[in-house]
Swiss-Prot record:
Name of the protein in question: Ribosomal protein uS12 methylthiotransferase RimO
Keywords: 4Fe-4S, Cytoplasm, Iron, Iron-sulfur, Metal-binding, S-adenosyl-L-methionine, Transferase
Record-annotated TRAM domain positions: 389-460
One Pfam family cited in the UniProt record for this chain: UPF0004
PANTHER family the UniProt entry points to: RIBOSOMAL PROTEIN S12 METHYLTHIOTRANSFERASE RIMO (PTHR43837), RIBOSOMAL PROTEIN US12 METHYLTHIOTRANSFERASE RIMO (PTHR43837:SF1)
Species of the source: Prochlorococcus marinus (strain MIT 9313)
GO MF term (any one): metal ion binding
Binding of [4Fe-4S] cluster 1, residues: C31, C67, C96
Domain named Radical SAM core: residues: 157-386
């Protein structure tokens, strides 16, 4: 891994002291956990009376919430920072890149007026006030311990009907390839009551889909209660008036019989399992420092299908890990072909300084790793197409997210598709010309499918919020 290539030729400008509070904009990069942090900073600044613009061009200060998970993410973050600096914007750099390279950023980008760590974003108002006073601020805790909760102001950036809820922060696992524990600290779970309170708040805002996130969501509560309490959390969220509760990052070790029973018994918990398995071969898993998984994968998947026969299964995989041979890869390909996941994401290995994998021998040539990724995705595509085709001829609920008033066409998602990472449903007006507004959940008859998406037609019913198609 190389450190981000930062520019050092931007001339330092004197800080201008103003009577009025500066206008602020946000640039959000990275994962949905980072998004929640951005939303809290937005809420805090708005509550403090700052003018927050959705357009970076209209703002004097831009808060850039960065990602540093892999090299590509770092490069995107640096490109964003340099582009804004060249526009003359004053920058507050937050997030994982700030946690990772705080000194380098301050030294190389004069426009960087403040650095805010992953465990320090709750201080964004104080940081901005210090910047206004002419101070250059480095507010980064070496060991992040903070986790936001329902008492922290929040201004959501997602569609009105979708919200992410962070149940814990940080990670206690030490996978050889992952830098996250060094950037976000050890696991800190929120109390069940705190999470449920925020879920009720989101329900009152009209949220239809609640997505639970953390680094290891199924290990929720282990640090706080001495044992995982994820099953109890799901049961408690069953009392919240939100139709869909989706779980991301369901690690295999946490999918106990009690948790699977909660998936089965709690009506609003979607039977959608996002399983970051990473690989199938025992030798690669040991090198990844995930040896416990060797005997788990097959047995776990069998148990899921036995208890949740209609479950939607997604997994993410890494190819090109140091020492991965062609035999190892073929083992993984056979595993994918045998298990027939609904959705698969494949990443090539990215060496990260500070991780055990960065020093491993037998690096796989990047061109070989890229070819393996392509081969695995080509193998998965007909499987995904087959899994989608099963829904043709059925009527399913679809959450509408976009609507074209000129054509009447709508785009939404059914419960088998998570936002951003999975497919969509193209919805045509009903036979009577009815259309649905974004944010509504409606019945759709599925008429077609492909590798990633479904196509359907709105079903005529008096039980849904619709608008009549305007005659041209």
């Amino acid at each position: 891994m190389t450190k981000p290539a930062l520019r050092s030729d931007i001339p330092m400008k004197p800080t201008v002291h103003k009577q009025e509070k500066p206008s602020v904009a946000f640039a959000h990069l990275g994962c949905e956990k980072n998004r929640v942090d951005t939303e809290h900073m937005l809420g805090l600044l708005t509550e403090a009376g700052y003018s927050v613009s959705s357009d970076e061009n209209d703002a004097a200060v831009v808060v850039v919430n960065t990602c540093s998970f892999i090299q590509d993410a770092r490069e995107e973050s640096v490109r964003t920072l340099i582009g804004l600096a060249e526009q003359g914007k004053e920058l507050i750099i937050a997030g994982c890149l700030a946690q990772h390279f705080q000194e380098e950023l301050l030294e190389s980008i004069p426009e960087a007026k403040a650095i805010v760590g992953t465990g320090d974003y709750q201080h964004i108002v104080d940081v901005l006030k210090r910047v206004e006073a002419g101070e250059r601020v480095n507010h980064v805790s070496e060991f992040p311990t903070f986790v936001g909760d329902e008492t922290l102001p929040r201004q959501r950036t997602t569609d009105q009907a979708v919200a992410y809820l962070k149940v814990a922060e940080g990670c206690d696992y030490r996978c050889a390839f992952c830098i996250i524990p060094k950037l976000r600290g050890d696991q800190r779970s929120r109390p069940v009551e705190s999470i449920v309170t925020e879920a009720h708040q989101l329900a009152e805002q009209g949220v239809q889909e609640l997505i639970l996130i953390s680094q290891i969501t199924t290990n929720y509560g282990l640090d706080l209660y001495g044992k995982p309490k994820f099953a109890e959390l799901l049961q408690a969220l069953g009392e919240v008036d939100i139709p869909w509760v989706r779980v991301h990052y369901a690690y295999p070790t946490g999918l106990t019989p009690e948790v699977l029973a909660a998936y089965r018994e709690v009506p609003n918990v979607l039977r959608y399992l996002d399983l970051p398995l990473q690989h199938s071969h025992p030798e690669v898993l040991r090198a990844m420092n995930r040896p416990w998984q060797t005997d788990v994968n097959e047995r776990l998947l069998d148990r899921i299908r036995e208890q949740l026969p209609d479950a939607v299964l997604r997994t993410t995989l890494i190819v090109g890990f140091p020492g991965e041979t062609e035999d190892h890869f073929n083992h993984l390909a056979a595993f994918i072909e045998r298990q027939r996941f609904d959705h698969v994401g494949v990443f090539t290995f990215s060496p990260e300084d500070g991780t055990a994998a960065a020093d491993l021998p037998d690096r796989v040539d990047p061109s070989i790793a890229a070819a393996r990724k392509d081969r695995l995705m080509a193998l998965q595509q007909p499987i995904s197409a087959e899994r989608n085709q099963r829904w043709v001829g059925r009527t399913i609920d679809v959450l509408i997210e976009q609507h074209n008033p000129e054509t009447g066409a709508m785009i939404g998602r059914c419960d088998r598709f998570a936002p951003e990472v999975d497919g969509e449903v193209l919805v045509l007006p009903s036979e009577k010309g009815l259309q649905a507004s974004p944010g509504t959940m409606v019945p759709v008859f599925i008429t077609g499918s492909d590798v990633y998406d479904l196509t359907g037609q709105l079903v005529d019913t008096n039980a849904m919020a619709v608008t009549a198609q305007t005659s041209q």
